[in-house]
C-alpha cells in the first residue's frame, strides 16, 4: 500500500488540468487543485490563490480522475483529499471537510462512504 501511495502521488504531479483565468488558458497540476465545484452550470477549479473555469463537466472530470486523490463529496463538488486536513460532524448526518487553506466544504451524507473508502484505500498524500 505505501507503494500505491507513492505511485499515486507521482501521477498527480504529472496530471495537468486546463483552466481559464482572466481569458487565458492555463495548465494546472492536479496536486495544486483543492476542489472542483459546479455553480450555475459552470465548473470551477479552486487552487490556493485562484479560481479557474473548466470547460469539462464535473462528471467528466470525475471520470478522468477516477484513479486519483479526487473524490465526489456532493452533487456539485469534487474534493482533492490530499488537501483535506480533517472532517467534523455536521447537521443532518453530513460532514464538514476542512481544507489546508482553512476553507470548509460540506460532504453530503450520500457521499460519506465514498470519501471514507477513498481515504482508507490509501489514495492520498
Which residues fall in each region the model found?
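Short, charged, intrinsically disordered terminal tails
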Residues: 117-125
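Conserved binding/recognition cores within well-folded domains
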Residues: 2-100, 104-106
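C-terminal structural segments of small proteins and small subunits
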Residues: 113-114
Amino acid at each position: 500500500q505505501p507503494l500505491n501511495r507513492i505511485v499515486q502521488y507521482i501521477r498527480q504531479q504529472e496530471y495537468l488540468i486546463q483552466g481559464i483565468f482572466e481569458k487565458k488558458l492555463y495548465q494546472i497540476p492536479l496536486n495544486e487543485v483543492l476542489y472542483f465545484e459546479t455553480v450555475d452550470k459552470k465548473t470551477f477549479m479552486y487552487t490556493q490563490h485562484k479560481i479557474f473555469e473548466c470547460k469539462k463537466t464535473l462528471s467528466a472530470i470525475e471520470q478522468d480522475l477516477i484513479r486519483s486523490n479526487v473524490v465526489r463529496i456532493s452533487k456539485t463538488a469534487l474534493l482533492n483529499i490530499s488537501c483535506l486536513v480533517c472532517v467534523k460532524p455536521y447537521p443532518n448526518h453530513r460532514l464538514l471537510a476542512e481544507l489546508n487553506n482553512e476553507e470548509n466544504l460540506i460532504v453530503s451524507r450520500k457521499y460519506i462512504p465514498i470519501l471514507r473508502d477513498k481515504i482508507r484505500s490509501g489514495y492520498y498524500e
